[in-house]
Amino acid sequence: MFSFLCLVELALPMSKTLVDSYGRRIRKLRVSLTDQCNLRCHYCMPVDAIFLEQSSYLSCQEYGEIIGELIALGLEEVRLTGGEPLLRRNFTEIVRAIGQLKLKKIGLTTNGIVLDRHLDTLGENNVLDLNVSLDSLNAKTFSEITHRNCLNTILRNLELASRQGFKIKLNTVVMREINDREIFDLIEYAKRWEMEIRFLEIMRIGYACRHQEKTFISAQELLAKIQQKYSLKPIQSALDATAFRYSTSCGGIIGFIASESQPFCGHCSRWRLSVDGTLRACLLKNEGINIRNFSSLERQHVYQQLLGMKPYLRPPEVSHAMHQIGG
């Protein structure tokens, strides 16, 4: 059944590419496979988080159809996210299906806890770009952030993936008086295992809003601190990149994702598909359109509609939780 919005959009011509009125071409899609997670990071979700019924999840076939339609409109890259995507029961089936599509790149964002169980599947389907969350190398601090005691498991799996040739970026949410004293240890760890590390500003999203003001550290403050120890050389990045990156005098590569202090909305090329089928033009917008039960024709009109829903300037804080939208 057509939604009212779709009926309105039927009067508009459909473009063969996803380019909005600001000239931003949508070429990347974040795809959530589950809202469940085996960590409880305090900036992401409460300890007693309530998750969706799995009957509301998109099926493997639905993922394939939606992503295939977007590829025909110019989509080039997909990143599988969660929650924790490796907890999806039919993860292998979904990865194999997406791996058969004509994408330039498929990546995965994970916390690494069960990564070792899936490395063969990932390698076989050319999912070689891994973003792994790692907020601390200290077991006590890690436990305080995540409410879990599994740091050694994650480090072991990271090192296994590195030895097997996966391209790994570590994502560290830096928080004042929590883990900000560890940035040099993290840089050295990443360099030792030939991983890039990216320092993220804590964002005003959902559950993090209650902590954000007290713990926020800007990317510029971190950069100045790091420059006291290392010489840094800028690395040129694509216009729509989320991070600004540097090579360091210690031989490593670091990046900064300054979503709060230096938002990159004006060049953003990403949409997000939640596990329940809600397609969003922006991480920081509550609004989205659930396309799960739409026909292919209906979805085509939604894609055009969504181009007009992507803001050019960064919206204020949003209420939905990060794990629910594939952050």
From Swiss-Prot:
Residues bound to [4Fe-4S] cluster 2: 265, 268, 282
Stretches assigned to the Radical SAM core domain: 21-233
The protein's enzyme class: lyase
Signal peptide per UniProt: none
Gene Ontology molecular function: 4 iron, 4 sulfur cluster binding; cyclic pyranopterin monophosphate synthase activity; GTP 3',8'-cyclase activity; GTP binding; metal ion binding; S-adenosyl-L-methionine binding
Binding site for [4Fe-4S] cluster 1: 37, 41, 44
A Gene Ontology biological process term: Mo-molybdopterin cofactor biosynthetic process
Pathway: Cofactor biosynthesis; molybdopterin biosynthesis
Residues that hold GTP according to the record: 30, 79, 109, 169, 270-272
Record text on cofactor binding: Binds 2 [4Fe-4S] clusters. Binds 1 [4Fe-4S] cluster coordinated with 3 cysteines and an exchangeable S-adenosyl-L-methionine and 1 [4Fe-4S] cluster coordinated with 3 cysteines and the GTP-derived substrate.
Record CDD domains: Radical_SAM
Listed EC numbers: 4.1.99.22
Cofactor(s) needed for function: [4Fe-4S] cluster
Alphabetic keyword roster: 4Fe-4S, GTP-binding, Iron, Iron-sulfur, Lyase, Metal-binding, Molybdenum cofactor biosynthesis, Nucleotide-binding, S-adenosyl-L-methionine
Binding site for S-adenosyl-L-methionine: 43, 83, 133, 203
Catalytic reaction(s) noted: GTP + AH2 + S-adenosyl-L-methionine = (8S)-3',8-cyclo-7,8-dihydroguanosine 5'-triphosphate + 5'-deoxyadenosine + L-methionine + A + H(+)
Subunit field text: Monomer and homodimer.
Family of the protein in this entry: Belongs to the radical SAM superfamily. MoaA family.
Functional note: Catalyzes the cyclization of GTP to (8S)-3',8-cyclo-7,8-dihydroguanosine 5'-triphosphate.
HAMAP family linked: MoaA_B
Name used for this protein in its record: GTP 3',8-cyclase
Organism: Synechocystis sp. (strain ATCC 27184 / PCC 6803 / Kazusa)
Gene that encodes it: moaA
